UniProtKB/Swiss-Prot annotation:
Domain of life: Bacteria
Location(s) in or outside the cell: Cytoplasm
CDD domains membership: RF3
PANTHER family xref list: PEPTIDE CHAIN RELEASE FACTOR RF3
Binding-site positions, GTP: 17-24, 85-89, 139-142
A Pfam family of this chain: RF3_C
Location of the tr-type G domain: 8-268
Gene Ontology MF annotations: GTP binding; GTPase activity; translation release factor activity, codon nonspecific; translation release factor activity, codon specific
SUPFAM superfamilies according to UniProt: EF-G C-terminal domain-like, P-loop containing nucleoside triphosphate hydrolases, Translation proteins
Organism of provenance: Streptococcus uberis (strain ATCC BAA-854 / 0140J)
Annotated protein name in UniProt: Peptide chain release factor 3
UniProt entry keywords in alphabetical sequence: Cytoplasm, GTP-binding, Nucleotide-binding, Protein biosynthesis
């Protein structure tokens, strides 16, 4: 098979949702169909000691939430599937945002009882900004939930995206009978020995069933007043195909996977800083680092740089240019993943995600190229933290471990690091409290460095240009600091302090990140 044909087989997507909507469970079921796991372990197994395959970090196993993005790969129905399971917890939005830059489509998991929740909305905005296709899986049909028509309406009103149902539930909760599959013109049955029935058979099976009659009425209404199906609108991110099912009981998941692979796009090109589009089918290898993860194997204190291959083919041992430094690097120790387990990879192509063993060479956002044509891909988004803590080592004798741990975790993007201009104190910035807890837990567990963390509360952060900097601007209402790239930054007590500063120094340009 040619490299071009291999590239066209790739389907790379992320799964996004609000916490507890069932994202990790559906990931497990997809891996089960891909033959990667013998049985799909449900996430509820905290007491039983069985954990979800994609939740591999110690703190994730303890708390049953995903706090890093896992990468998993399998072959199914002639396609090579790359799934990126993103953190559902709201505190981990930065890692999630960056992961969404490395995929060609997104699967949005929605709880049928709760509908669109805050985190789903935030993540959807990032996906919408990229203009990639979104496939919706409305989960937990085995429990009582909201009316399907109401859920579709909410999708359109809250997220502003048109929807098209690919199947329709027959009852729900204890009265759940199955799905009317509009795409394949058949019924998928929840109970009994037969999994599928044709529509004629189904009509006999559900004769006088009030739920089935309601389904027929709903479908008639959708055909008259609903959106038209359009593959073009799906691929441009304007129309989301909607699937109903139950990940926990593995119902409707395989039908979803089959249909998803029918419509999901091949690998996309990516834009450079200059606006040039790099085509996946180009001969020369290129890729970008979208994530760095330390200690995926705690026994070896390792660091892995996750690279999305944008074009061409990776071959083990190849030399690449690191555009940021202008230096060359040899890619010999490269892996592909199944959450925490990994295997050495000899070659991979555009659309694949590879893990490059990193000794401190790479940073998030780095571009790797081969050949004379050197370029940089568009920068990945950074976010503005709201919560801050002072941090210092509990044991002065452990300074070395403290600095190593902090440097590695900050490079991962788990937290942001700032240093007080006047006192030299270290400060950490995060979107939510859980990030600090994970930082503390990992510093102690992975680097044997206990830390003292002192809350500083909420701050309003703005960056300024080096040439505008005057230390006299510092006052009791703000803290002047430097970020880890040595850029000057002000941490204001509140919005009032920010406005006061802006009025006093009208010529100073204050910049806010995402």
């Amino acid at each position: 098979m040619s490299i071009q044909e291999e590239i066209k087989k790739r389907r790379t997507f992320a799964i996004i949702s609000h916490p507890d909507a069932g994202k990790t469970t559906i990931t497990e079921q997809l891996l089960y169909f891909g033959g990667e796991i013998r049985e799909a372990g449900t996430v509820k197994g905290k007491k039983s000691g069985t954990f979800a395959k994609s939740d591999w970090m110690d703190i994730e196993k303890q708390r049953g939430i995903s706090v890093t993005s896992s990468v998993m790969q399998f072959d199914y129905a002639g396609k090579r599937v790359n799934i990126l399971d993103t953190p559902g917890h709201e505190d981990f939005s930065e890692d999630t945002y960056r992961t969404l830059m490395a995929v060609d489509a997104a699967v949005m998991v929605v709880d049928s009882a709760k509908g669109i929740e805050a985190q789903t909305k935030k993540l959807f905005e990032v996906v919408k900004h990229r203009g990639i296709p979104v496939f919706t899986f409305i989960n937990k049909l085995d429990r009582d939930g909201r009316e399907p028509l109401e859920l579709l309406e909410e999708l359109e009103e809250v997220l502003g995206i048109a929807s098209f149902p690919m199947n329709w539930p027959i009852g729900m909760g204890k009265a759940f009978e199955g799905l009317y599959d509009l795409h394949n013109n058949r019924l998928e049955l929840y109970k009994g020995e037969n999994r599928f029935a044709d529509l004629e058979e189904g009509a006999k099976l559900f004769a006088n069933n009030p739920f089935y009659e309601q389904v027929l009425d709903d479908i008639e209404l959708l055909q008259e007043a609903g959106n038209e199906f359009s593959e073009e609108a799906i691929l441009s991110g304007e129309l989301t195909p909607v699937f109903f099912g139950s990940a926990l009981t593995n119902f409707g998941v395989q039908t979803f996977l089959d249909t998803f692979l029918e419509f999901a796009p091949e690998p996309h090109g990516h834009k450079t800083k200059e606006g040039q589009m790099i085509d996946p089918l180009e001969k020369d290898f290129s890729g970008f680092v979208f994530k760095i993860q330390a200690n995926m194997d705690p026994r070896h204190r390792d660091r892995i740089a996750f690279v999305r291959i944008v074009s061409g083919e990776f071959v083990k041992g190849m030399g690449v240019n690191l555009t940021r430094t202008g230096k060359g690097a040899k890619l010999s120790n490269v892996t592909q993943f199944m959450a925490e387990s990994r295997e050495n990879v000899q070659n991979a192509v555009a659309g694949d995600i590879i893990g490059v063993y990193d000794t401190g060479t790479y940073q998030v956002g780095d571009t790797l190229t081969v050949g004379k044509h050197k370029f940089e891909f568009e920068p990945l988004p950074t976010f503005t933290p709201e919560l801050f803590m002072k941090v210092s080592p509990k044991n002065v004798m452990k300074q070395k471990s403290f600095h190593k741990g902090m440097e590695q975790l900050v490079q991962e993007g788990a937290v942001q690091l700032y240093r007080n201009y006047q006192t030299g104190e270290y400060m950490l910035g995060a979107v939510g409290q859980l990030q600090f807890e994970v930082f503390k837990h990992r510093m102690e567990g992975e680097y044997n460095a206990e830390v003292i963390m002192t809350p500083m509360g909420k701050k309003t952060v703005r960056w300024i240009k080096e040439e505008d900097l005057d230390q006299r601007m510092s006052s009791s209402r703000n803290i002047l600091a430097k970020d880890r790239f040595d850029q000057p930054v002000f941490l204001f007590e509140n919005d009032f302090a920010l406005r006061w500063f802006a009025d006093k120094y009208p010529d100073v340009q204050l910049e806010e990140k995402m």
